[in-house]
């Protein structure tokens, strides 16, 4: 397996729609010249942006977290340019970008140091061969203070690894439960 470069990411996005919308280079300023947390293609990865839809974890309904029987009332929905995650809490969001992963590629997501250095951890499971959709992002606020997440700005980096052989069964082949997801997607069994 080899990590893929900016040239490969650009070509796959422009010719095959691997990342839509695709941002060339690292975007660091908005149209008014204000600083952003960077997003777009980098040397060996792609920094994704967070959309304006969030689900923030709450316990107003005294729910129990059960991945086999998840209660949607465990979250409150927020649509905003900024999401405030309560101390020691959790939020879900999604990428602005829609991904179509090639059959011989595995994509791994890592958090951005800008957030990690503030105690905000991003978790995403690997994007498997032939998976497609908006990526659901999981944010953990590990601090005892409220934390901000900015929509429209970089939140995580995707790394693309191309295998030297094609897998026998892709995510699409086995009918993966998150195939084609749009919006923030809650746990499924």
Curated annotation (Swiss-Prot):
Pfam families: DCD. SUPFAM superfamilies: dUTPase-like. Pathway: Pyrimidine metabolism; dUMP biosynthesis; dUMP from dCTP (dUTP route): step 1/2. GO terms for biological process: dUMP biosynthetic process; dUTP biosynthetic process; nucleobase-containing small molecule interconversion. One of its GO terms (molecular function) is dCTP deaminase activity. The keyword Protein biosynthesis does not apply. DCTP binds at residues 112-117, 136-138, 157, 171, 181. HAMAP family: dCTP_deaminase (MF_00146). Homotrimer. This is dCTP deaminase.
């Amino acid at each position: 397996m080899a990590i893929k470069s900016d040239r490969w990411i650009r070509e796959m996005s422009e010719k095959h729609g691997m990342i839509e919308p695709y941002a060339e280079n690292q975007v660091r300023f908005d149209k008014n010249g204000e600083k952003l947390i960077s997003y777009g293609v980098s040397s060996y990865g792609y920094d994704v942006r967070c959309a304006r839809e969030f689900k923030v974890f709450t316990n107003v309904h005294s729910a129990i977290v059960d991945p086999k029987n998840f209660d949607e009332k465990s979250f409150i929905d927020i649509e905003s340019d900024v999401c405030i995650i309560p101390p020691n809490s959790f939020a879900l969001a999604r990428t602005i970008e829609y991904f179509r992963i090639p059959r011989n590629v595995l994509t791994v997501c890592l958090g951005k140091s800008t957030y990690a250095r503030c105690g905000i951890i991003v978790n995403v499971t690997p994007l498997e061969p032939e998976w497609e959709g908006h990526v659901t992002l999981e944010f953990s606020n590990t601090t005892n203070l409220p934390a901000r997440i900015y929509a429209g700005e970089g939140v995580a980096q995707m790394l693309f690894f191309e295998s030297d052989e094609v897998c026998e069964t892709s995510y699409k082949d086995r009918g993966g439960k998150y195939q084609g997801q749009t919006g923030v997607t809650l746990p499924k069994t």
